[in-house]
Amino acid sequence: MEVKNFAVWDYVVFAALFFISSGIGVFFAIKERKKATSREFLVGGRQMSFGPVGLSLTASFMSAVTVLGTPSEVYRFGASFLVFFIAYLFVILLTSELFLPVFYRSGITSTYEYLQLRFNKPVRYAATVIYIVQTILYTGVVVYAPALALNQVTGFDLWGSVFATGIVCTFYCTLGGLKAVVWTDAFQMVVMIVGFLTVLIQGSTHAGGFHNVLEQSTNGSRLHIFDFDVDPLRRHTFWTITVGGTFTWLGIYGVNQSTIQRCISCKTEKHAKLALYFNLLGLWIILVCAVFSGLIMYSHFKDCDPWTSGIISAPDQLMPYFVMEIFATMPGLPGLFVACAFSGTLSTVASSINALATVTFEDFVKSCFPHLSDKLSTWISKGLCLLFGVMCTSMAVAASVMGGVVQASLSIHGMCGGPMLGLFSLGIVFPFVNWKGALGGLLTGITLSFWVAIGAFIYPAPASKTWPLPLSTDQCIKSNVTATGPPVLSSRPGIADTWYSISYLYYSAVGCLGCIVAGVIISLITGRQRGEDIQPLLIRPVCNLFCFWSKKYKTLCWCGVQHDSGTEQENLENGSARKQGAESVLQNGLRRESLVHVPGYDPKDKSYNNMAFETTHF
């Protein structure tokens, strides 16, 4: 494979990304040096605005996996990825209206604190361990992806770039904490959009204009977006993306520490919701850019596919190879694209490191040593950032054998994120579920999702369900083409063509629904949780979202929890809690016999702010 090298200006543009990102970390380390508390370091003092937080949310999950993987998916399988437009909308609506209010009003720092309040410590610790494993695995994939791009376009050592990425991320995350991560993410989000726009403009010019791109994509069957086939074995259809994609991304947004940590860092609940909706706009923009980049790439390579012709060795190298071709005479712009890919990775890795440090400190260190000084807590938090930076970087080695970056990353989120989504749904939506049901449901969901994912890895789905759309090599100058027919499958068990062959986007749904069903059944068998033992602000039955439901049905959904519409409004306006030193609002118990009024609810905005946390949490 021919390697195309960077020019001097490419290195200048690329290096600028690293210097500016590191500089932001240094800036916040100096600016916040007098506020040496773990609270300031981990949640930015809970005084962030929705703008930078919204950009940070988008950048954190629109990583190099999106920059490199999504255009490649569209190039090979068509523009059905646009259906994620609908899935993202459902995800943000459910996150902002169902999950966020519970987490924000609690004053917690780690999402998994909620599980101890609702169930008990074993459930909390089990979920925390699963989250740590999931995040390290996922981060390994997104570190490896841009390193692959850099290796493809410059010949720079693959593992050298992996370690360079990890070092820079760990550096500014350890120095500046959450504020540095959020503001660096905002900068990197801008770089991602600019990088995509340059590819769209130059690529469409090379292809003869945008109209020509659409015409050639239509002729190549790349614009067949809405496939309503209900077969769950099909890789991408309208239903696999809307249903499976919603479950997958809801696990990422609704109950993920990286997301919730940013939301609770906002100054009010209203700002937190605005951040999510602002982030939705960013998700749509990046999705459209990535999909049209894939269509432009198909238009460019329609007569000579570099993948099947052997010019490149993996589908994830398509995008960087395409960029080097269209910017061959424009020094600096290939560097901008690689900076675009690395921007996504730096933001994701830094967010993951910060979140891992937070849950480890809050769920393990603080539980064992509750009376640590602020200074020591901050140093421990920074040490944890350093430790997880090393672990995430090392995990990238394993990502090299995981196949396509998009499927690998979403499979990881599905295997772990689905059961976690089910666990939090049991706690928030089903008041009668007890801790035995929660723990049993979590183990069931994990078992089911790993069973199907590992089975799919050993026995890949039949080619008829996953084979790409036709690709041509008719006009390749150097044709060393190998036959690309469907692979010959060895002896397979019957389950391999059914259970193991479901779309990877359904892994999360399998884990989530398995967790919920098992949790409900176990709770009914072992004895339902008494409603009187549950604090109202710990749950949010779905009936709350439907104002047209009668009071009778709403009362039924609350399963005996001491609650009615009047009580709910009173709880919102009073933010009732009892004082117990440095415990959070929900940890304060909300017992009726010891209620005091805690500031933090603005009746005019109908939104919480962080005054409550200033008063009672620290």
Curated annotation (Swiss-Prot):
GO terms for molecular function: lactate transmembrane transporter activity; monocarboxylate:sodium symporter activity; organic acid:sodium symporter activity; symporter activity. The keyword Cell membrane applies. One of its GO terms (biological process) is sodium ion transport. Glycans are attached at residue 480. It is found in: Apical cell membrane. Residues 31-47, 104-128, 179-180, 257-275, 343-385, 433-437, 526-618 are cytoplasmic. Cotransport of monocarboxylates and nicotinate strongly inhibited by ibuprofen, fenoprofen and ketoprofen. The chain crosses the membrane at residues 10-30, 48-68, 83-103, 129-149, 158-178, 181-201, 236-256, 276-296, 322-342, 386-406, 412-432, 438-458, 505-525. Keywords: Cell membrane, Glycoprotein, Ion transport, Membrane, Sodium, Sodium transport, Symport, Transmembrane, Transmembrane helix, Transport. One of its GO terms (cellular component) is apical plasma membrane. It is a multi-pass membrane protein. Its main location: membrane. It catalyses: (S)-lactate(out) + Na(+)(out) = (S)-lactate(in) + Na(+)(in); nicotinate(out) + Na(+)(out) = nicotinate(in) + Na(+)(in); pyruvate(out) + Na(+)(out) = pyruvate(in) + Na(+)(in); propanoate(out) + Na(+)(out) = propanoate(in) + Na(+)(in). It comes from the Eukaryota. The keyword Amino-acid biosynthesis does not apply. Residues 1-9, 69-82, 150-157, 202-235, 297-321, 407-411, 459-504 are extracellular. CDD domains: SLC5sbd_SMCT2. InterPro entries: Na/Glc_symporter_sf, Na/solute_symporter, SMCT2_SLC5sbd, Sodium:Solute_Symporter_SSF. Belongs to the sodium:solute symporter (SSF) (TC 2.A.21) family. Acts as an electroneutral and low-affinity sodium (Na(+))-dependent sodium-coupled solute transporter. Catalyzes the transport across the plasma membrane of many monocarboxylates such as lactate, pyruvate, nicotinate, propionate, butyrate and beta-D-hydroxybutyrate. May be responsible for the first step of reabsorption of monocarboxylates from the lumen of the proximal tubule of the kidney and the small intestine. May play also a role in monocarboxylates transport in the retina. NCBIfam families: sss. This is Sodium-coupled monocarboxylate transporter 2.
